Amino acid sequence: MKPTHTALIAMLLMSGPALADGGVSVPLPDTSGMPAAEAKALMSELAQVNVITSNCPDYALDDEDWTLITGTGDRLAAQLGLSAGDYDREFYGPAFKLLDDPQACDRIGPTAAPLIERLKSMGGGTTPTTASQ
């Protein structure tokens, strides 16, 4: 990927609402002043909740909640200058390993709602701002 494309993608991820594959867009929290260590801890939590809620039917999320979680993780990755490969390796690799633990769904799944509330308290939201036509 050309450097200008990478910079453009990073700018898009760091500004405005996030758009889900289904066309749902939600406002993302302001993470611009978050220290790197705190951002990485939040990214780990976001990846774990994303993997568990996507793979454990009892804890499935709606499109708006999912978009808030994934959009925030993407924004933080861009903020920290992580490539897609580094982001997957550092955060999603360990999160997917949780699926080997039969207790992971019931341990991580209930943390989704408090995480979403935390993101809302930081300025994020789950009310769609646009929808696909």
Q: Where do the PLM segments sit?
A:
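Compact alpha-helical subdomains of small soluble proteins
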Residues: 27-28, 64-133
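N-terminal signal peptide c-region/cleavage motif recognized by signal peptidases
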Residues: 15-17
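Bacterial N-terminal signal peptides that target proteins for export
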Residues: 1-7
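Short N-proximal segments of mature Sec-exported proteins
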Residues: 26-82
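Hydrophobic helical h-region of N-terminal Sec-dependent signal peptides
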Residues: 8-13
